[in-house]
Amino acid sequence: MPRLVDHEERRRSIIETTWRLIAEQGIENASMRDIASECGYAAPGVLAHYFPNKDALLLASYELICERTNERIAAGTAGRRGLSALRRLCLEIIPADPLTVVEARVAVSFWQRAQTEDALRAVGREALLHWRGLVLGFLAQAEHDDECAPLADPDAVADELLNIMMGLHVTSMLDPDAVSGSRQRHLVERALARLAVTV
């Protein structure tokens, strides 16, 4: 058992190193040699014990970003419902702190590759569908609890919120000073405040 735990810890360490290099250098410039060197390995072949090739490493890296985001959402929304839970979900997804900024830089890099790589696209699509389902569930709770006016088109509301969150990933990368963490949180609060009045 300890050997399995060690193997998994090393895989995660390699993935986290990959995130850092992608965030600093871009996905195309983060070579297996650079990743191995940053991990303290003399040769990139050592990485093959954990990932057969760069594509497999990138896929695992994207999967772990989505997994960690989902873990934060689950922790942040535990014991909450309706608009309170929806607020926490939005705040966990947007890149508004140093950790999520790194994740966003990496995720945006993956989105470009996902246009031509089915496996990456499937991971991103699964995450979006999961978040959309959560948003719709929290909206239904908000309606039930009279936190917001009846929603004529909850699907459209869910799509609007998701596009705000995904859009903030892009605009915060292009202009981080203008689209700061506080600015992102303000935009999320504005969107949720509109729900409490009318849709």
Feature-to-residue mapping (PLM):
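Amphipathic alpha-helical segments used for helix-helix packing
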Residues: A85, P98-A122
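Generic hydrophobic, amphipathic alpha-helix propensity
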Residues: R10-W19, I35, S61-I65, T69, ...
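Hydrophobic/aromatic-rich alpha-helical bundle segments in the mid-to-C-terminal region
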Residues: V101, R121-L129, E143-V199
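Helix-turn-helix
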Residues: S13, R20-A56, A60
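Hydrophobic alpha-helical connector segments
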Residues: A60, I73-A104, P154-L161
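N-terminal intrinsically disordered/low-complexity leader segments
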Residues: M1-E9, V199
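Residues in soluble alpha-helical coiled-coils and helical-bundle/repeat scaffolds
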Residues: P52-A56, T77, R81, P98, ...
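Amphipathic, non-transmembrane alpha-helical scaffold segments
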Residues: H7, R11, Y62, C66, ...
